Amino acid sequence: MLNDTTSKDYEYEYDQEQYSDLLNVPVDCPAGNCFSNDAYLIVLLGLYSVIFLVGVPGNTLLAWVTWKESRHRLGASWFLHLTMADLLCCVSLPFLAVPIAQKGHWPYGTAGCWLLSSITVLSMYASVLLLTGLSGDLFLLAFRPSWKNADQRTCGVRVVQVSSWMLALLLTVPGAVYRKLLQEHYPPRLVCGTNYGGSVTAEVTITTVRFLFGFLVPLVFMASCHGILQRQMARRHWPLGTAVVVGFFICWTPFHLLRVIIAVASSHSPLLAWALEAEPLVTGLALAHSALNPIMFLYFGRKQLCKSLQAACHWALRDLQDEEESAVTKVSTSQEMVSEMPV
């Protein structure tokens, strides 16, 4: 997916850390089913364009709506932070599209290589950590009565949101350290890639950290929270909070699994060849998540879509409030029934 020259002696170039840089097209095709370079470029440029055209205005509108709502509804602040993370990714896409159009040549220098790759990785980590916090918030609302206290919850949510961004930044740094401008000779060009200097330990460590903290641990936690909440909900439906979490993992699961395959597959193996061929499509799916939340808001607010996009987003946020109130009401009712039972 991304340009990379690493310790693996292989005819394909790939990036072990970033996910939104230029995707290198395979230079040979053991399976005999590669697309042409031009076809890959057209698909990638088209995909980046769609994500940018949907994601930037969509997330901008969503940021405005959630900012206004967050002054009255604490739950809306989660989506404000998520929207900012998605917007970071979306605004970087035109810059990342230029190397694609130039068939791999990186025009932004060393600083641009480090900065653009860091922005997109930061967006990924921030999104998954904020979604983890949102899931925990909904779970505590349902099963910890004291969490309903306005002051306590407000303080806790703010701390988690700030901590999510700080931890995301911290997790971004190790991979950024290995981002370098690399000189290729066939064809001659400068590429922005990852160079571990032959350190297998560094490569495995960064891949493992990204997989655990960017995927597996949040997945287990969120699946547990929303699975329990779904059983407790007074209404049987897919609420906005759950839908956003599911959308994230639909987009990102193939990417994380493919990165593990690329990290552990032996050089020259058919498995590595297949993984690198699949990489452009998988990366595109992951990047598409940054434009997904505005679409979800329009779907959940479709009853008000005839009025305006802003009205639809406002209506969708009501679903989150209903989700919070439904979980709290369900648990409160259960507790009342228990307290009324004869001893």
UniProtKB/Swiss-Prot annotation:
GO biological process: complement receptor mediated signaling pathway; G protein-coupled receptor signaling pathway; inflammatory response; negative regulation of interleukin-6 production; negative regulation of neutrophil chemotaxis; negative regulation of tumor necrosis factor production; phospholipase C-activating G protein-coupled receptor signaling pathway; positive regulation of cytosolic calcium ion concentration
Any one GO molecular-function label of the UniProt entry: G protein-coupled receptor activity
Membrane topology: Multi-pass membrane protein
Signal peptide bounds: none
Transmembrane portions of the chain: 45-67, 79-101, 121-143, 156-178, 209-231, 244-266, 281-300
Family: Belongs to the G-protein coupled receptor 1 family.
Gene3D superfamilies associated with the record: Rhodopsin 7-helix transmembrane proteins
GO cellular component terms, semicolon-separated: apical part of cell; basal plasma membrane; plasma membrane
Disulfide bonding pattern of the chain: C113-C192
Subunit field text: Interacts with C3 (the anaphylatoxin peptide C3a and the adipogenic hormone ASP); the interaction occurs with higher affinity for ASP, enhancing the phosphorylation and activation of GPR77, recruitment of ARRB2 to the cell surface and endocytosis of GRP77.
Keyword Nucleotide-binding: no
Entry-annotated residues carrying Phosphoserine: S326
Primary location recorded for the protein, binned into one broad class: membrane
Subcellular location: Cell membrane
Keyword field: Cell membrane, Disulfide bond, G-protein coupled receptor, Glycoprotein, Membrane, Phosphoprotein, Receptor, Transducer, Transmembrane, Transmembrane helix
SUPFAM superfamilies for the chain: Family A G protein-coupled receptor-like (SSF81321)
Cytoplasmic side, ranges: 68-78, 144-155, 232-243, 301-343
Organism of provenance: Rattus norvegicus
Glycosylation sites (chain numbering): N3
Record topological domains on the Extracellular side: 1-44, 102-120, 179-208, 267-280
General function of this protein: Receptor for the chemotactic and inflammatory C3a, C4a and C5a anaphylatoxin peptides and also for their dearginated forms ASP/C3adesArg, C4adesArg and C5adesArg respectively. Couples weakly to G(i)-mediated signaling pathways.
Protein name: C5a anaphylatoxin chemotactic receptor 2
